[in-house]
């Protein structure tokens, strides 16, 4: 395997040379014998900031590939007492050995095992699950392997089922009814969290989001794991519900049950999806710590993008409602010219943009007030 040295953050690692695995002048990271995707640098950059605040004693990257993520955590975030890197691909495990040595890390434990098998053998304070596709096969094992009040980080790239484009796949993987709705970018993340909560409950544990976001073609989610059947029951009863959207007028709301429900505005039957998580997507105290800290990482290649994302999330995090997609709402209302988002925010007074969609707004003001602004500004 021909290797190429690359720099990401403050580390230098060897990866398969893309030129050796091109097909008709094109390259996909999955074609190489060991997976490395430079498009996920933003994901890793933000994760470096998160881990720097958590300072876990044990870090476990269960699906390490080149080892880039765990190595960056150790070098840039926090020199943990123990760094555990694993990949079931023996070629990847060998490459991890090279990359760990290349970055002067002496206390790393490297495994060449199936991720689930390893997760049922050991415990960790911080576990990272960054699979190719859905994290569902690793939810139970990662929650089980996390110590009390530990953290699990999940990446999900299978947006088709989560956003309602592939309904049967969503039902099969996430045990949720789904449709493509106006706010599906956010609802997909809530379906994912709902699935994790239900899986954790089978172990008499529960999870709460610490920080989460949507970017490019994936969701990234950090959850804190708590033990106790009572806590699991409370979280399910309080934070797992359904979501309804009116296909005629665009009114949307959380609903308690998956049953035929009429829109209170126009009387049309709701399209209902779920179950999904209805609580906050971030821990506000932790979010504040991220905002206070990220400037220390101005060397990151995606620093400006991180700054923009955190600025938007800081503003939208205080609102409890799912965002309204003004473009989709205007279409349902037969409003031909979509008003500028900034004008709608000014009209509403208490509202913000959302990172989920460029034409989305988040506010706790009522549907009627949003409609008034949309129509008055056309």
Swiss-Prot record:
A GO molecular-function descriptor: tRNA binding
Protein name stated in the entry: tRNA (guanine(26)-N(2))-dimethyltransferase
Binding site for Zn(2+): 246, 249, 263, 266
Enzyme Commission identifier(s): 2.1.1.216
Similarity annotation: Belongs to the class I-like SAM-binding methyltransferase superfamily. Trm1 family.
Species this chain originates from: Saccharolobus islandicus (strain M.14.25 / Kamchatka #1)
Gene coding for it: trm1
HAMAP family, per database record: tRNA_dimethyltr_TRM1 (MF_00290)
The organism's taxonomic lineage, starting at the top: Archaea, Thermoproteota, Thermoprotei, Sulfolobales, Sulfolobaceae
InterPro entries in UniProt: SAM-dependent_MTases_sf, Trm1, TRM1_arc_bac, tRNA_met_Trm1_C
Catalytic class of the enzyme: transferase
Reactions catalysed according to its record: guanosine(26) in tRNA + 2 S-adenosyl-L-methionine = N(2)-dimethylguanosine(26) in tRNA + 2 S-adenosyl-L-homocysteine + 2 H(+)
Biological role: Dimethylates a single guanine residue at position 26 of a number of tRNAs using S-adenosyl-L-methionine as donor of the methyl groups.
Keywords for this protein: Metal-binding, Methyltransferase, RNA-binding, S-adenosyl-L-methionine, Transferase, tRNA processing, tRNA-binding, Zinc
Keyword check for tRNA processing: yes
Residues annotated for S-adenosyl-L-methionine binding in this entry: 44, 69, 87, 114-115
Superkingdom field: Archaea
